[in-house]
């Protein structure tokens, strides 16, 4: 087709419309058709067209027997009468006229039956109108960029205009009012001109071709058999039988019964879809042409006709329509109303979004329900929050209903009965399928309990009690231990109160292992949670039975595996991936990264410290450990084919558990060395307490664990002592497992450990010691920290300390008891989600299990948890159906009977269970009551788009809308065979199960209906399927859905032969819209066209601006499009939010959730910025999103923090930001600034609110302060140095002092800025110059100095600089620090000799320098002070602390004589130092290197013996000399200090560096015993030296 198009603009009410004025010539040669003309004009009066518009629920359009009246026909003239008869019948039935038919009936010759393209002429506007429109539009268009350029927030980038907010971010979906104009910025943020209306200006006259096509494309009849529909509703994928087929694209021929064509070949819901269809199909059929929004309706219709002709040609050449079905299906998926675009948002559900099925609906009555009680978790089972439980704002209901796929309505009593039926089938599978009870499952794992009605817990518990008597005794209970996957903290107490019939996980302990051990070092927590953050506090666990039973695990098939794979795919493979929807290829790539990461010491994704986690799991008391397959074998790869790096460690622990792990438990965590450690001890079988002695088995059982989570850990010489219990005194222990620099070394036998030198012996109190070299941190693929596990030497090879369960009747009302027998169990989660598909029979999981039972036995496995054995769905909608792990199924009775599932066939399952039973293992089935995946049959259901809680998504296009779901099973599957099949039998055997009223409904289960075929009425809802909001077709005007049922018949008029040209048109007065369903002008109706929402008022014309419609507020731009998902800021600065349906959020909306975000609305305004709600200050950003757990700086520069839960401004508390800066929020919630007193702390905060730590602050008064680097406290009374090396002194008030100061006896000086003066002079206010030492800063006296100005100054005795001539007879220090002397004549002495000073003292000058200190001159021992003046008649304490005396006349030092000074008598010995003062009785004194002693009688002791001094302390004198140090006196080893005083009752470090302790009574050194010293116990060995540090 060749087409020339001219575009014109016409101004209508200040809006501009693009008019397309086109002429088209379609060449007949394009189709090889001969050219013929129609002699008779077709009628164009719409009023004469056949229009059918019956009420959808009451009126009929036609009966099955009535054909639609023809408007044109290709039949031969012989068919005319028949057509006339049909028309007449149609008139009678529908009460309408068909004048067009009569006209059409005159064109019956063969040539006229062929399709011939005609030229379309556009009419309706004068040249003057078009010219004016063009000129004005050009001027208007040119002015727009200049207007935008004037806006300060708008910037042009790559030719487009963007609006930037105050933070520099581009605003999207945003409209702003500026003056009298409104500017709109679309979803990309780019400005979009909304002043133009795209409307069709062509003539509304109907072409002859359009009439012919309409006549032949009408439905063959309105009988439902002529339509492909879902529950009689037409969909975008519907096909129908037209009246005629344009055979080979040339000749209209009556259709046959199999000649179905796509509905979209003849009808489209709007112009945009029609244009998209033409453009899409042009490519399919080989037409090189693209149509735009400016294309007229007439040209678009002609293009669609050409596409239809080409389609028919290709059908003829291909001889099938398979290709067409594929093309149409693919096209449908491209249209937003028929794909996920109209189902958004995608952030509130694991599968992007949820659909809630309406309970009451006239449109789909077969899908109604009286139940669908959502979120009836243990926390909310009755519909009200259980008062027993603590409210958790992060998990308000303890779970939610919509998890995955088709969500089973577990509140429906009929469904509840079916769940019981299925449970019975599952547990009796061997008996039912193979007539072999030995192949029955023993127990179940309840999947995703927090996502189903908690009544299922009651039903399953009651069945287990009735069928197995688990409440009768522990033996029965332990043979049928069923577990629950329930993550809420409320679930375990719920199960406990219900009788502990089912066992829940210890999720707290899982989290403790995750954060203490498995995470990278920079985010790891301490080790203390491993003791206390658990269902069992293990600091001291000497209980016979724990309060609640539980099982524990580190990882699982769906925990800490698929999350990591998801993260890898998102980060490194497909950044556009969402949630858990990824392909097998992406999974395979991710596992290459995952497996390599597992082998690294520095991991990016996988878990650290797996051996440490398993050490705790497999040695802890009070919970059944569950080992995960993927920790021993790679998650991917064939089953059990590839061991992980942690396999040997876990296997070693498993085998040791059977042999050693028993008894009470004690755990400790404390700081030691440069880090912290965790210790755990099990005392052995028969010893619950540390003091229990037990028996022989006790002595050969038990285990000790020491671990840490810091790879740089060192004991730093400290000792760790493990109290292994009284039963293990003086016993050898050997290593079972030790971390090394390369990994983890394991030792299977005593001999292996002995050979490695890893054997220790406990002391007589049962302590096992670890010294400095024993415990060192390492970093390798297995351990990031350190690990040691020790067990007793001497256990028999076949020792098994496990305990059998008792058959004594239970009397406490509980079924499961976590006692020693329960502790003896080990679960094995025997599969991975991601294991590879078998390539041959021997690779199937169940085959491999049967062949490896002995291995599981050797590990001590007691309960084998099988993978879910259901044949998987392959719909690929979610990870589970991609990897086919068994959790995505459509027939839950099919355990590999119809075909092999991922794990094998039903027969292989039977063999695996029997093999496990043969070795005494119990086998657990996976019971998955929550969801079912894509069924083979579809239904139309009335649905509402909701979040995972079932709360409607505000503004969603899916609101009580019809939607096609995959919710109906085949009716000929195993569900049909076994569904409800056992209910009668169960009711007879266990009648109590059918009379007990369930908590959520108050009703008993209902066995009266046997569910043989699943359908929507049994489901709560489903996930969104990407079919779009309008996939079930409807009339936009009446909102009626097209339906082909005889009693609710409603079809588009196009299918009844009427020519319908829909879309927006300009009629010379305004903009109107013709319905795509009827062709009539729309009035008082919303219309969606090209994804835009319009409203046409009561007069039929398009509205603009703010409008209130049916009580709701909307805003329509100049081009008539409604604001949707858009924030509009009006001229007053108020923000309004228009939802996806165009409605403005109003006051009654209050808080509204948008995905994970919240907004607040009042009086039609959206909260932006600081807002007070119910008395609480909250903050909403520029887009209205509430700030939670965020620090916000508001426009006034103030800092606030808003609570992570309620969003309220936090007050009177400290907070820290992500960079480590701290703030204090005052009583008004604003971060304080400046100096503040908080509690007893004096703190300072910058102007931005950040607390000052480790830095100086200058106050407004100019005072300098310093604040501590850790606490932020203001420093007082202390010196501090800044980064530049300047020193300051902070006074009592914290301010840096200035001027002259005397601090701690030092005379110092500080500048006006607080800096201390060092190495420089200061001119005081008295005009005098002083100098302060360069190192100490102390004022200098009697010294010559060189100041910073380069000048030399002589500082006198008073510290003031003087003229040298005034220092006669004085000493002083010169600039080099040497002490010089001016004689009494004022002359500087440069020689040597004695000189008298001005105060009549004497100095001795040697080579010009005055001597100081001890000197020997001419045989005399003399002493000179620091200023060089000789000491006479005075005592001098030397640098060695000893006292000497110098004669008052000669100055000679006194030797071997007594001297009385100031009334005290001193004796100076051989070395000239004072020995004693005053009364010498009972005193020692130094005589050179010897110590001597005066007895209490005052006699100098010269012999040997024990003596008591004046203080009652004991000494020993030997040959006149007092003994010191470690000595042997008689038979005693004793110790005397440096003064000769005997040590008693104290620990002493002796000369060999060792610490010894001496008895408090005898003073004898103790050996080979513990002793408490300063509150801590130490062990002292055979030589008396301390060996170990023990406990506090």
Swiss-Prot record:
It catalyses: [(1->6)-alpha-D-glucosyl](n) + sucrose = [(1->6)-alpha-D-glucosyl](n+1) + D-fructose. It is an enzyme of class 2 (transferase). It is found in: Secreted. Residues 39-108 have a biased composition (Low complexity). Its EC number is 2.4.1.5. Keywords: Dental caries, Glycosyltransferase, Repeat, Secreted, Signal, Transferase. One of its GO terms (molecular function) is dextransucrase activity. It comes from the Bacteria. Residues 1093-1592 are annotated as: Glucan-binding. PROSITE patterns: CW. Residues 200-1044 are annotated as: Catalytic. Pfam families: Choline_bind_1, Choline_bind_3, Glyco_hydro_70, KxYKxGKxW_sig. Residues 1-38 form the signal peptide. Cell wall-binding repeats lie at residues 151-170, 172-191, 1083-1102, 1103-1122, 1167-1186, 1211-1231, 1232-1251, 1276-1296, 1297-1316, 1411-1430, 1455-1474, 1523-1542, 1567-1586. One of its GO terms (cellular component) is extracellular region. Gene3D superfamilies: Aspartate carbamoyltransferase regulatory subunit, C-terminal domain (2.30.30.20), Cholin Binding (2.10.270.10), Glucansucrase (3.20.20.470), glucansucrase (2.30.30.420). InterPro entries: Cell_wall/Cho-bd_repeat, Glucan-bd_rpt, Glyco_hydro70cat, Glycoside_hydrolase_SF, KxYKxGKxW. Its main location: secreted. One of its GO terms (biological process) is glucan biosynthetic process. Residues 39-119 are annotated as: Disordered. GTF-I synthesizes water-insoluble glucans (alpha 1,3-linked glucose and some 1,6 linkages), GTF-S synthesizes water-soluble glucans (alpha 1,6-glucose). GTF-SI synthesizes both forms of glucans. Production of extracellular glucans, that are thought to play a key role in the development of the dental plaque because of their ability to adhere to smooth surfaces and mediate the aggregation of bacterial cells and food debris. Belongs to the glycosyl hydrolase 70 family. This is Glucosyltransferase-I.
């Amino acid at each position: 087709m060749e087409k020339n198009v001219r575009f014109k603009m016409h101004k209508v009410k200040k809006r501009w419309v693009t008019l397309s004025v086109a002429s088209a010539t379609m060449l007949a040669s394009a189709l090889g058709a001969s050219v013929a003309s129609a002699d008779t004009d077709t009628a164009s009066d719409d009023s004469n067209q056949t229009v059918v518009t019956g009420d959808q629920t009451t009126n009929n359009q036609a009966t099955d027997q009535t054909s639609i009246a023809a408007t044109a026909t290709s039949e031969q003239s012989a068919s005319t009468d028949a057509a006339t008869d049909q028309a007449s019948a149609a008139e009678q039935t529908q009460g309408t006229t068909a004048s067009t038919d009569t006209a059409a009936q005159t064109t019956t010759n063969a040539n006229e039956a062929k399709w011939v393209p005609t030229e379309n002429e556009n009419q309706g506007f004068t040249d003057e109108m078009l010219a004016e429109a063009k000129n004005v539009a050009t001027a208007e268009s040119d002015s727009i960029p200049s207007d935008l350029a004037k806006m300060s927030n708008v910037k042009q980038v790559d030719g487009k205009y963007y609006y930037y907010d105050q933070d520099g971010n581009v605003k999207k979906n945003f409209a702003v009012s500026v003056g009298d104009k409104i500017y709109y910025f679309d979803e990309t943020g780019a400005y979009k001109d909304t002043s133009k209306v795209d409307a069709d200006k062509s003539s509304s006259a109907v072409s002859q071709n359009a009439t012919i096509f309409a006549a032949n494309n009408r439905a063959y009849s309105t009988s439902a058999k002529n339509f492909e529909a879902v529950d009689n509703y037409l969909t975008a994928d519907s096909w129908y039988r037209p009246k005629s087929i344009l055979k080979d694209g040339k000749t209209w021929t009556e259709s046959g019964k199999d000649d179905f064509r796509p509905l979209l070949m003849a009808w489209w819901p709007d112009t945009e879809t029609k244009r998209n269809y033409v453009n899409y199909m042009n490519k399919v059929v080989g037409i090189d042409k693209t149509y735009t929004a400016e294309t007229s309706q007439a040209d678009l219709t002609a293009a669609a006709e050409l596409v239809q002709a080409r389609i028919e040609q290709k059908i003829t050449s291909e001889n099938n329509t398979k290709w067409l079905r594929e093309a149409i299906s693919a096209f449908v998926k491209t249209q937003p109303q028929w794909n996920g675009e109209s189902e958004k948002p995608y952030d509130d559900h694991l599968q992007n979004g949820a659909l809630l099925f309406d309970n009451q609906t006239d449109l789909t009555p077969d899908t109604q329900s009286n139940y669908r009680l959502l979120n009836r978790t243990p926390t909310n089972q009755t519909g009200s929050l259980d008062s027993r439980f603590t409210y958790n704002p992060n998990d308000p209901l303890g779970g939610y209903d919509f998890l995955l796929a088709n969500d089973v309505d577990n509140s429906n009593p009929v469904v509840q009965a079916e769940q019981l039926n299925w449970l019975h089938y599952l547990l009796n599978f061997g008996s039912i399928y193979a007539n072999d009870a030995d192949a029955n499952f023993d127990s179940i794992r309840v999947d995703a309990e927090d996502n189903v009605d908690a009544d299922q817990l009651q039903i399953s518990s009651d069945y287990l009690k009735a069928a197995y008597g688990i409440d009768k005794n522990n033996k029965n209970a332990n043979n049928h231990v069923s577990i629950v996957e329930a993550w809420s903290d409320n679930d375990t107490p719920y199960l406990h109160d219900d009788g502990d019939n089912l066992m829940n996980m210890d999720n707290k302990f899982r989290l403790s292992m995750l954060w203490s051990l498995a995470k990278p070092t920079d985010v790891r927590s301490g080790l203390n949670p491993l003791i206390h953050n658990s269902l069992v506090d293990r600091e001291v666990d000497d209980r016979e039975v724990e309060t609640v039973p539980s099982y524990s695990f580190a990882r699982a098939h769906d925990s800490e595996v698929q999350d990591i794979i998801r993260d890898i795919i998102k980060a490194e493979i497909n950044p556009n991936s969402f949630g858990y929807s990824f392909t097998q290829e992406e999974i395979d790539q991710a596992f290459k990264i995952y497996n390599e990461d597992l082998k690294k010491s520095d991991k990016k994704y996988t878990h650290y410290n797996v051996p440490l986690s398993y050490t705790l799991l497999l040695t802890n008391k009070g919970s059944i450990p569950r080992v995960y397959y993927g920790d021993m074998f790679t998650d991917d790869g064939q089953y059990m084919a590839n061991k992980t790096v942690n396999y040997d460690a876990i296997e070693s622990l498993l085998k040791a558990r059977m042999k050693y792990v028993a008894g009470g438990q004690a755990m400790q965590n404390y700081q030691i060395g440069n880090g912290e450690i965790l210790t755990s001890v099990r005392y052995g079988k028969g010893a619950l307490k540390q003091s229990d002695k037990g028996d022989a088995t006790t002595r050969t059982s038990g285990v000790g664990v020491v671990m840490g989570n810091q790879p740089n850990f060192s004991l730093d010489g400290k000792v760790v002592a493990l109290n292994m219990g009284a039963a293990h005194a003086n016993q050898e222990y050997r290593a079972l497992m030790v971390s090394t620099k390369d990994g983890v070394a394991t030792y299977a036998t005593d001999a292996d450990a002995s050979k490695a030198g890893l054997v220790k012996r406990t002391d007589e109190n049962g302590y096992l010691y670890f010294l400095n070299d024993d415990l060192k941190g390492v970093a390798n693929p297995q351990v990031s920290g350190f690990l040691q596990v020790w067990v007793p030497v001497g256990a028999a090879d076949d020792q098994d300390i496990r305990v059998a369960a008792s058959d004594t009747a239970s009397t406490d009302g509980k079924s499961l008891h976590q006692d020693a027998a329960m502790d003896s169990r080990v679960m094995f989660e025997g599969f991975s989600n991601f294991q590879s598909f078998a390539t041959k029979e021997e690779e199937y999981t169940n085959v491999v299990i049967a062949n490896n039972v002995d291995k599981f036995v050797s590990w001590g496995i007691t309960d084998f948890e099988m993978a879910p054995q259901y044949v998987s769905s392959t719909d690929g909608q979610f990870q589970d159906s991609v990897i086919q792990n068994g959790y995505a199924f459509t027939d839950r009775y099919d355990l590999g009977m119809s075909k092999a599932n991922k794990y094998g066939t039903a027969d292989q399952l039977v063999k695996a269970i029997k093999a496990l039973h043969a070795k005494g293992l119990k086998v657990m089935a996976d019971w998955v009551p929550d969801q079912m995946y894509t069924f083979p049959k579809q239904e139309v259901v009335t649905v509402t788009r909701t979040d995972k809680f079932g709360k409607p998504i505000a503004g969603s296009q899916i609101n009580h809308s019809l939607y096609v779901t995959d919710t109906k099973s085949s009716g000929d599957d195993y569900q049909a065979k076994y569904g409800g099949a056992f209910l009668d039998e169960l009711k007879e055997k266990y009648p109590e199960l059918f009379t007990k009223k369930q908590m959520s409904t108050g009703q008993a289960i209902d066995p009266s209906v046997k569910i043989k075929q699943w359908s929507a009425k049994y489901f709560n809802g489903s996930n969104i399927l990407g079919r779009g909001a309008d996939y079930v077709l409807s009339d936009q005007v009446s909102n009626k859905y097209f339906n082909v049922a005889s009693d609710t018949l409603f079809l588009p008029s196009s299918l009844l032969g009427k020519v319908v040209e829909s879309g927006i048109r300009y009629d010379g007065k305004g903009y109107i819209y013709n319905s795509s369903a009827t062709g009539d002008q729309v009035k008082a109706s919303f219309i969606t066209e090209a994804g835009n929402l319009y409203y046409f008022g009561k007069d039929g014309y398009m509205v603009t601006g703010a409008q209130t419609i049916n009580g709701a507020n909307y805003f329509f731009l100049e081009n008539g499009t409604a604001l949707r998902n858009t924030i509009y800021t009006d001229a007053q600065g108020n923000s309004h939010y228009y939802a996806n349906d165009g409605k403005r959020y109003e006051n009654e909306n209050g808080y509204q959730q948008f995905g994970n975000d919240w907004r607040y609305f009042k009086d039609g305004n959206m909260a932006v910025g600081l807002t007070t709600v119910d008395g609480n200050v909250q903050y909403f950003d520029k887009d209205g999103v509430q700030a939670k757990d965020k620090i916000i700086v508001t426009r006034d520069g103030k800092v606030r923090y808003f609570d992570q839960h309620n969003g309220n401004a936090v007050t009177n508390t400290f907070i820290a930001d992500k960079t480590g800066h701290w703030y204090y929020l005052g009583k008004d919630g604003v971060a304080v600034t400046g100096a503040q007193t908080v509690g007893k702390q004096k703190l300072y905060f910058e102007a931005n609110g950040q607390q000052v730590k480790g830095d100086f602050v200058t106050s407004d008064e100019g005072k300098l302060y310093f604040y501590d680097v850790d606490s932020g406290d203001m420093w007082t009374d202390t010196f501090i140095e800044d980064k530049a090396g300047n020193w300051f002194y902070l006074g009592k008030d914290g301010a840096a002092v200035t001027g002259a100061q005397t601090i701690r006896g030092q005379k110092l000086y500080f500048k006006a800025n607080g800096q201390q003066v060092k190495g420089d002079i200061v001119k005081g206010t008295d005009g005098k110059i002083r100098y302060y030492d360069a190192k100490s800063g102390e004022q200098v006296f009697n010294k010559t100095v060189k100041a910073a100005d380069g000048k030399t100054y002589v500082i006198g005795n008073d510290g003031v600089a003087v003229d040298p001539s005034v220092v006669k007879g004085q000493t002083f220090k010169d600039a080099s620090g040497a002490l010089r002397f001016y004689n009494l004549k004022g002359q500087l002495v440069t020689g040597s000799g004695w000189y008298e000073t001005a105060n009549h003292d004497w100095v001795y000058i040697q080579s010009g320098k005055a001597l100081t200190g001890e000197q020997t001159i001419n045989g005399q021992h003399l002493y000179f002070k620091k200023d060089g003046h000789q000491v006479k008649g005075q005592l001098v304490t030397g640098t060695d602390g000893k006292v000497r005396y110098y004669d008052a006349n000669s100055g000679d030092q006194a030797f071997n004589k007594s001297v009385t000074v100031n009334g005290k008598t001193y004796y100076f010995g051989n070395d000239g130092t004072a020995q004693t003062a005053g009364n010498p009785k009972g005193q020692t004194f130094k005589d050179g290197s010897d110590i001597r002693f005066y007895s209490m009688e005052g006699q100098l002791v010269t012999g040997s013996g024990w003596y008591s001094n004046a203080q009652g302390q004991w000494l020993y004198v030997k040959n006149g000399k007092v003994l010191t140090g470690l000595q042997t006196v008689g038979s005693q080893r004793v110790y005397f200090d440096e003064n000769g005083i005997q040590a008693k009752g104290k620990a002493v470090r002796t000369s060999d560096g060792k610490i010894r302790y001496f008895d408090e009574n005898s003073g004898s050194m103790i050996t080979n015993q513990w002793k408490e010293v300063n509150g801590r116990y130490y062990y002292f060995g055979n030589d008396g030296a301390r060996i170990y540090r023990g406990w506090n």
